[in-house]
Amino acid sequence: MENIRNFSIIAHIDHGKSTLADRLIQECGAIEDRKMSDQVMDTMDIEKERGITIKAQSVRLTYKKDGKEYILNLIDTPGHVDFSYEVSRSLASSEGALLVVDASQGVEAQTIANVYIALENDLELIPVINKIDLPAADPERVKADIENTIGLDCTDAIEVSAKTGQGINELLDAIIERIPAPSGDPTAPTKALIYDSWFDSYLGALALVRVFEGEIKKGQEVLVMGTGKTHEVIDLMYPHPINPQKTSTIKTGEIGIVVMGLKNIGDVQVGDTITDAKNPTPEPIEGFEEAKPFVFAGLYPIDTDKFEDLREALNKLKLNDAAIAFEPETSAALGFGFRVGFLGLLHMEVVKERLEREFGLDLIATAPTVTYKVKKTDGETIEIQNPSELPPPQEIDTIYEPYVKATIITPTEFLGNVLNLLSEKRGVQLKMDYITQDRVMLEYEIPMNEIVMDFYDKLKTVTKGYASFDYEPSGYKEGDLVKLDIRVAGEVVDALSIIVPKEKAQYKGRELVKKMKELVPRQLFEVAIQASIGNKIIARETVSAMRKNVTAKCYGGDITRKRKLLEKQKEGKKRMKAIGKVQLPQEAFLSVLKID
């Protein structure tokens, strides 16, 4: 056991942790050079394209130092805020972490969030300054930056360039010297933490575990404590991005893949504890929580016959991503579809893209919403995920909306813009600290609803891409909210309803109908587009009718003749308007997402 080191890599997006992982793997010779590819740990196409890590991956490396052979278990973590639960489980499985910071950029909000998780788990942190080969690199400034924001001593920070491979050997030596070996009682009952799980079409649902006490053997009956079900261990493997090695036992302090022939990934949820069925451990590992979706959106197939295909695709994705929740719903405008819950906006984009890419579906997504709590006048409290479920105004006593605590780091020159954006989004300042003279860290409370739409894009725009942002949920607060409906030709279009703060309703309504006017195709009769709160219309635009020139065939002659033809046309238009239906184009639904 004293020769094992378990460590994770913590970094903000784009600070180079997947490349660093590549170099460590190459240096330890775990993959032959000819099979090596960039970002070998990111296995999904979409991860490579966007340059982000979505699923945590692991690899077991061997490294010789001073004549001893060491086993290094590298646990790669996702860097994005939506996947922070996966990060916290990966860190709980390690004894140490490499804090990777870009030498040209300095500390970012995401890094800080993950460092706090690491400190809560008492991990040994090794600061690593990456990308020192860049002309803009300034390692000394970055070290000062880390000391100011995190209070971590950087005198023996390690400077590396993952791209050129400079400093990698020093880093491996530091991992062995500074990260403690795992502790735990090898004779105690089995106790292992599932820190990742995924679905393999041949082997079923697989659990990636870290064994804390005892060991897991092939053929053992094990109990998964969160579900209370027992399974037989069919196979055990050590993780590797290309060819995992089989083994007969995973011992205390090691990481490995457990194959139990499961059909459903819900049986091995991330954060759950595996123990021996006959001699279970008394307490599960703490900190297990079911992944809770925060953002909801409707997903509808453009071709309505594809509803069953979408159901099947969602079921398959859920095997791989336990954080998705979904239930069928219908909309008068869009037909049959599903209300799907996601961890956040990036998660939503990734899921939609995977559905379209891996299952060949054409989908339309409605505006994302959050879960509101509504206290009704009869004292009952209900939760709603879809604006169209909101009860009529006379039945509502109060509406509560979810808030988040956001941490934003921005260069000082853009501070004014950022503060304006935050007050526009109804944010409340908690604190403001200057990290260095030219960078500020802000803490704000913001309604989740304001973040869901386009907050991140806007923050990047007003700071020219330099600000970074991270958030965590902070509970519910009372809000002065109303439901804004859009009526086309007198009928409410359910898929376009949104919940907005009362003081913004007028403005949003006006903007929306203006936008809709450009998108609704002209009909043979005039179409009124209205925004309403309950029965009160607050804004209106009219799409004028297309008309035929009915008087073209009259040459000269009496005006009454022309008038008769025009009156007749008018009557016809009136009749059409009474029975006419308007087909809305796809763009109309997407326009709701884009109003400010």
Curated annotation (Swiss-Prot):
Coiled-coil segments on the chain, per record: none
GO function terms (MF aspect): GTP binding; GTPase activity; ribosome binding; translation elongation factor activity
Pfam short name (any one): GTP_EFTU
A GO cellular-component term linked to this record: plasma membrane
Membrane topology term: Peripheral membrane protein
Enzyme superclass (EC): hydrolase
Gene3D superfamilies: 3.30.70.240, Elongation factor 4, C-terminal domain, Elongation Factor G (Translational Gtpase), domain 3, P-loop containing nucleotide triphosphate hydrolases, Translation factors
EC number: 3.6.5.n1
PROSITE patterns tied to this protein: G_TR_1, G_TR_2
Superkingdom of source: Bacteria
Domain tr-type G, first and last residues per copy: 2-183
GO biological process, one term: positive regulation of translation
Binding site for GTP: D14, H15, G16, K17, S18, T19, N130, K131, I132, D133
Annotated family: Belongs to the TRAFAC class translation factor GTPase superfamily. Classic translation factor GTPase family. LepA subfamily.
Name of the featured protein: Elongation factor 4
Gene that encodes the chain: lepA
